[in-house]
Curated annotation (Swiss-Prot):
PROSITE patterns: RIBOSOMAL_L2. GO terms for biological process: cytoplasmic translation. It comes from the Bacteria. Keywords: Ribonucleoprotein, Ribosomal protein, RNA-binding, rRNA-binding. Coiled coil: none annotated. GO terms for cellular component: large ribosomal subunit. One of the primary rRNA binding proteins. Required for association of the 30S and 50S subunits to form the 70S ribosome, for tRNA binding and peptide bond formation. It has been suggested to have peptidyltransferase activity; this is somewhat controversial. Makes several contacts with the 16S rRNA in the 70S ribosome. This is Large ribosomal subunit protein uL2. It comes from Syntrophotalea carbinolica (strain DSM 2380 / NBRC 103641 / GraBd1). The lineage of its organism: Bacteria, Pseudomonadati, Thermodesulfobacteriota, Desulfuromonadia, Desulfuromonadales. Part of the 50S ribosomal subunit. Forms a bridge to the 30S subunit in the 70S ribosome. Belongs to the universal ribosomal protein uL2 family. Signal peptide: none annotated. Residues 213-261 are annotated as: Disordered. Transmembrane segments: none annotated.
């Protein structure tokens, strides 16, 4: 995938870039793997805003992705590489030998016509799914399970991967995209390779309207609000807020750690950078 630049026909267009979508091979998704997707506008069941700066955006349909890869020992041929509006990665339509079709995350290097399989005897090549026990040290993997059979939860965004750093007992040490080193059961499943669409991080939005297409609403600074709305609000004329930066609920921000200690902390060998 390459990055496409535009002629500066307007201020918003000047620095805008986008993906060239050259890797996309199908215009429409597989109908049997598409579901309706309702928007919440950031509201919960009581109608209250629980997620600020969310709403609007282009209509989407949800593509059902196979994160579990539980269809073992049956080879699947890649029929197409497709765009998915619900994630940064591309998705691949896998047609299994028994006739079933499923979407999987498209790893870097996967092409139409390639054959992938979920098996303990599978080759170590992009798109094949194995338990971590069967994958050599130093291999890049994505779509990694944290609980056996639950489905992949780690390293699913465009361009991400984790590296298998060590194995000891029933656990393996994985170096995650955040820099965190974490213990994961060796019987958990992972897919070989790096998630595709690696240039996604280099796309520049360019203008506010493009964020609105993505369902993102504007953010107002706390110092521009009234005291009733934010701890930084109010003051005569322009003010700096008068205190260390905090959230609208008074919790320190910009570096303040808010992660709560929990039972799974013992599986973290080294914290993220």
């Amino acid at each position: 995938m390459a990055i496409k630049k535009y002629k500066p026909t307007s201020a918003g267009r000047r620095h805008m870039t986008s993906a060239d979508f050259a890797d996309i091979t199908a215009a429409k998704p597989e109908k049997s793997l598409v579901e309706k997707l309702n928007k919440s506008g950031g509201r919960n069941n009581a109608g209250r805003i629980t997620k600020r700066h969310t709403g609007g955006g282009h209509k989407r349909k949800y593509r059902v992705i196979d994160f579990r890869r539980e269809k073992k020992e049956i080879p699947a041929k890649i029929a197409s590489i497709e765009y998915d509006p619900n994630r940064s990665a591309r998705i691949a339509l896998a047609c299994y030998a028994d006739g079933e079709k499923r979407y999987i995350l498209a790893p870097l290097g996967l092409k139409v016509g390639d054959v992938v399989i979920a098996s303990e005897q599978a080759d170590i090549k992009p798109g094949n799914a194995l338990s971590i026990r069967s994958i050599p040290l130093g291999t890049w993997v994505h779509n990694i399970e944290l609980k056996i059979g639950k489905g992949g939860q780690l390293a699913r965004s465009a361009g991400t991967y984790a590296m298998i750093a060590a194995k000891e007992g029933k656990y393996a040490q994985l170096r995650l995209p955040s820099g965190e080193v974490r213990l994961v059961l060796q019987d958990c499943c992972a897919t070989v390779g790096q998630v595709g669409n690696v240039q996604h991080e280099n796309v520049k939005i360019g203008k506010a309207g493009r964020n609105r297409w993505l369902g993102k609403r504007p953010q107002s600074r706390g110092v521009a609000m009234n005291p009733v709305d934010h701890p930084h609000g109010g003051g005569e004329g322009k003010s700096s807020g008068g205190r260390h930066p905090v959230t609208p609920w008074g919790v320190p921000t910009k570096g303040y750690k808010t992660r709560v200690n929990k039972r799974t902390d013992r599986f973290i060998v080294r914290r993220k950078k």
